[in-house]
Amino acid sequence: MASNQPNNGEQDEQLAKQTSKLSMSAKAPTFTPKAAPFIPSFQRPGFVPVNNIAGGYPYAQYTGQGQNSNSPHPTKSYQQYYQKPTGNTVDEDKSRVPDFSKKKSFVPPKPAIPKGKVLSLGGNTSAPKSTKPISISLGGTKAPTTTKPAAPAAQSKTETPAPKVTSESTKKETAAPPPQETPTKSADAELAKTPSAPAAALKKAAEAAEPATVTEDATDLQNEVDQELLKDMYGKEHVNIVFIGHVDAGKSTLGGNILFLTGMVDKRTMEKIEREAKEAGKESWYLSWALDSTSEEREKGKTVEVGRAYFETEHRRFSLLDAPGHKGYVTNMINGASQADIGVLVISARRGEFEAGFERGGQTREHAVLARTQGINHLVVVINKMDEPSVQWSEERYKECVDKLSMFLRRVAGYNSKTDVKYMPVSAYTGQNVKDRVDSSVCPWYQGPSLLEYLDSMTHLERKVNAPFIMPIASKYKDLGTILEGKIEAGSIKKNSNVLVMPINQTLEVTAIYDEADEEISSSICGDQVRLRVRGDDSDVQTGYVLTSTKNPVHATTRFIAQIAILELPSILTTGYSCVMHIHTAVEEVSFAKLLHKLDKTNRKSKKPPMFATKGMKIIAELETQTPVCMERFEDYQYMGRFTLRDQGTTVAVGKVVKILD
């Protein structure tokens, strides 16, 4: 009996007929027997992309495959590949087929107007300040931005974009087609007269667009840097002061009391020092022990080395240098004075002590002269010990001391009594008129400021911040490396920078900078008292050498011409005379090679060279040293061009460098 069920071939034909009558909607299930696996059209070989104005993928792609898009398949489904389609997305209602007939006819978008070319000079890629675009014509006259070029007749009516200009790195530009209308003249069009505009024309065009020139920017930046450098780490100006004067005038006592009154030495430490001084039988010296720290200085009551301390006022920071007042330590005093900006000349008003220090043999005169020759142009004269029973804040005694000092400082030392010198009475031991003004009941005749009040309100000092770096070496010692100490006379220094040691031409690297408070800092400027840790071959570096800029080193010479004023001389001075020269921190033996001229009171030179020189004369001479010494002309750098001559413990002359011969 034959089976009524159709065979496999007949079933396929029936299913095919049914399938052909199905509508192909968004969810219409389709099936083609023995069809190939589903492969999206864009993955088939030879696929050519066609712009789909409706966005997304066209639905007709499934009809050719004969597969249900929702059926499982080895390849990934359409939803997995296109979960976040780009461009226009299909409506979320998948059952609705998009009606493309309602879409407007597609019109290609107009090409965007080319943006103005921005020329970047000096690596600055930031946008120009002006919002007006800059157009540079490279093929003759420039087309105006408001006129559109006419399209060629062979092309469609759609607007043709302007030709593109290649980047500046290729250095090749395509000339723009000439416009039909006559353009307006501009500075940019006049600059571009050749097919390839020169670099100079491009640079001028960019400068015309930006009003601020490179030179102005550099000047403003330099001014900002200078202002930042002049602001110290605490926002206060740094000043170096040195206490000078005859032995036992009260320099160390005054310095110790300043440290206590400014809080640099706390009360507990001061009580400990006072207790130690009382046990040693020197109770009245306890304030000076804050600076005189060595056993020799405390035992003898005399300062030997230059004491160093640091204190602050409201507007300034101070490095205090306590110079020895004994005659045998004048060399140390010169070393301290060479690093100071302001000198404090301490005078004892006690009967007999003032006369001993000011008359012949005392150090008051010599210290005042040395301070002037070492570049201390402002002197504060402190009349100390006004509380002594022999004085008792006497106005008569105060004026007596001031009158004698003012005459000497004006005639011999060269200070102007009205502008360069300030006098004030104090009591270093009791602290009266040191920080706070003396009470009117104690001293009714003095109405001026106290010592610290005056130092804090002085006019600002001149600093050569922009000059090449110069720092004479005041001391050298080992502390986890080599430490070089001194005062920066010009310029500035930064950590990890290189410096040149003159006169030996040795390069060193600055690995660390420490200020007067022993704190490490990244940079320092002129006027600061610093310690530099250096790296390199420093075996030959010694005190008196100069750290300087590697690009602009100081001069080092063995022969120079100087103008000299003779102060004290036991005999006559002739050719071949030798003595010791103190210049900045260097100490070197020098000899007179030639006596060139004698100067009269008006500084007029004599026609014939003098045979000899005596006390009170001014001469011009040629001097020689055995080894090179760092120096500069006095008119160029005063602190590197002035010197002092000493012989047998006496200051015989002072001078300034006029000309460097080598």
From Swiss-Prot:
Low complexity biased stretches: 26-40, 141-158, 192-213
Modified sites of kind Phosphothreonine: T182
Domain tr-type G: 236-464
PTM annotation (Phosphoserine): residues: S539
Compartment(s): Cytoplasm
CDD domains: EF1_alpha, eRF3_C_III, eRF3_II_like
Chain spans, region G5: 427-429
Region (Disordered): 1-220
InterPro entries per UniProt: G_TR_CS, GTP-eEF1A_C, P-loop_NTPase, Sup35, T_Tr_GTP-bd_dom, TRAFAC_GTPase_members, Transl_B-barrel_sf, Transl_elong_EF1A/Init_IF2_C
G3: annotated segments: 322-325
Protein function: GTPase component of the eRF1-eRF3-GTP ternary complex, a ternary complex that mediates translation termination in response to the termination codons. Sup35/eRF3 mediates sup45/ERF1 delivery to stop codons: The eRF1-eRF3-GTP complex binds to a stop codon in the ribosomal A-site. GTP hydrolysis by sup35/eRF3 induces a conformational change that leads to its dissociation, permitting sup45/eRF1 to accommodate fully in the A-site.
Oligomeric and partner information: Component of the eRF1-eRF3-GTP ternary complex, composed of sup45/eRF1, sup35/eRF3 and GTP.
Protein name: Eukaryotic peptide chain release factor GTP-binding subunit
Gene (name only): sup35
